[in-house]
């Protein structure tokens, strides 16, 4: 007998739209082995759903790290197949997408569009024209403009989304990066009594003023009709497989736009991150950071030290989501400063080859080092980051216990943990992360 599984980090709101998008993931999650496979998946989806000319075609799960021989999806592939439809295929990291020409035009992206700090706009070789892939801060204005479903559609989607989680044994889900309009969707669902699993939301720091104009600090930390505002989310960097995570040393493969000596870039400056976290702490709220690279984790630690004024006695349960390329010395700091880690061992299966290419075998082998973290005394959890990876809690457990790649190769076997420890990461430890250890896990 096991308790209901607790999701330490995913994107619940994305489950609502899964049925409205084509699965463009590579095997074993989806059928798209190469750019042609992505196009076929989109065409089949458009045919089955009778999408008319001019209507948007959406896909999810595109993984450039799995495309053969560096043959990456670009706008030309999509333009040829969909000359009359805007098309957007979400990157597997959820930090960007590949758009065709009509979609680029729809969202105002052109040769005149400058790349913002912390953003990526891949350009067609020899030109300044966007070639399809838009990532990180450059993608945020596009994401904000995505079409919204009707109220009737939302009601059905909320039910189907919860069933994705419930079918995997999850009784507490996380909406781990919530825009205000998505929070309103969740709030309306809760008010209507449509939630049958618990959902914990972490609104983006960039929308904190708008959120706090609707809610008070007393609204955080408690469930109301199965919805809880857990705290605030601060995203410090991107994804390592997308080469947008922020490191102290360069990527072996350069940057996504061909940059040399590329270490990635932070989403915000250190000073901005410091001020953001202090605002969260001054409100008495929990913070979850998104940080993958070791330089991004350094920024989280510095912000925590600044915002806390060096007082680490308060029970804040600040959590660094992913913590994938954390260094041993940073784990020591986690313990000293009472920072939690939510790891992501499924990367040892899904993205190990990309990490070895990008970061080298030694660093890739210390990916999500749960055994070392637990031995040092770090309280840690383990997550899917759905829909980056499928909702499958037993796969989460398996990946932490075995650390085997898609190709059957061990990835840092010295960091394997026991089945019991792996279960704790999605039950009792996850309950602790949410301040719910007295009643869950």
Where are these regions (language model features)?
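Acidic/histidine-enriched ion/cofactor-binding microenvironments in catalytic or ligand-binding pockets
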Residues: 221-228
